């Protein structure tokens, strides 16, 4: 006998199985008016962009409103992902400017996000992934509820497993300089399915070693984006520095 019809997803799924069809769950994101916006495509695109480029450039500090100029220089050099930390002055406005200008071709994220309220603000500004220095299950869950990528900070195998079990898309290994590529290689043995992104003190040479050890990508802060960009000729030097960093990471140097 065919199962009875009803209005809930469980009944719909049962009926679909009866007829040999398949129901895909709908994931929801930011509210627009009285509706929810489905964002699985945006999330998948974000993860693909980071995986393709291997490097997330991190803004931390005051760059005098030059964020879009800085991102343009790095994008010209081949960068595919950027993170603006909430410790930067006027960070939400900066995220919004960068997302509006580059969201169609770069993954634009927010860093140092430590509360669910901050997740909401970053999502509204256009961020498509959330990075934290710590592992907070509530922040992970809220990021996923809004259809955003979630990269919480982890330092131990237990924290990595707990983060992934809570729904994290990747574990930000932080501070990576205290652990090194050997840690990534060791952790990939029992946890080959986990995406690991070392961040903190990641020079081009060390970045290549992390990737060779099995890292999914790396986060680069002052190694790429620093106060030199505000000096005369700084954007040209940033473009060259970014190109050299990416070449080293991709084994082309």
Regions found by a protein language model. Give the residues of each.
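Glycine-rich phosphate-binding active-site loops on the catalytic face of alpha/beta enzymes
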Residues: 134-139, 173-180, 215-234
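Helix-adjacent hinge/juxtasegments
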Residues: 109, 115-157
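Conserved N-terminal beta1-alpha1 strand-loop-helix module at the mouth
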Residues: 35-125, 145, 193, 204-205, ...
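Catalytic cores of alpha/beta
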Residues: 115-125, 159-166, 203-218
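Extreme N-terminal basic, low-complexity initiation segments
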Residues: 1-9
